Curated annotation (Swiss-Prot):
Its EC number is 6.3.5.-. This is Glutamyl-tRNA(Gln) amidotransferase subunit C. PANTHER family: GLUTAMYL-TRNA(GLN) AMIDOTRANSFERASE SUBUNIT C, MITOCHONDRIAL. Allows the formation of correctly charged Asn-tRNA(Asn) or Gln-tRNA(Gln) through the transamidation of misacylated Asp-tRNA(Asn) or Glu-tRNA(Gln) in organisms which lack either or both of asparaginyl-tRNA or glutaminyl-tRNA synthetases. The reaction takes place in the presence of glutamine and ATP through an activated phospho-Asp-tRNA(Asn) or phospho-Glu-tRNA(Gln).
């Protein structure tokens, strides 16, 4: 299935993305190849193959909750650019980025 450059531009507009003409051409070609590969996979006969939801053979691997000694605070704070009251101070990411 061929993905047209117009379809790429349409989806880009919906996603509020902008691409150059060469990027649009590249995306159209790449997406067409991806869709072709998925269509090829859809042709594979999976009759009689058990449904697989995970490749891991273990579920809910648990360990004992044991307190362990952490990193030496003096060593940890040695490379910290800013600290306050024995805490590492970082820029706030909410409320306009002011101090937390």
């Amino acid at each position: 299935m061929k993905i047209s450059e117009e379809e790429v531009r349409h989806v880009a507009k919906l996603s509020k993305l902008s691409f150059s003409e060469s990027e649009t051409t590249t995306f159209a070609t790449t997406l067409s190849k991806i869709v072709d590969m998925v269509e090829l996979l859809n042709e594979v006969d999976t009759e009689g193959v058990a449904i697989t939801t995970t490749m891991a053979d273990k579920k809910n691997v648990m360990r004992q909750d044991v307190a362990e000694e952490g990193t030496d605070r003096a060593l940890l704070f040695k490379n910290v650019p800013e600290k306050e009251n024995h805490f590492i101070k970082v820029p706030a990411i909410l409320d306009d980025g002011g101090d937390a």
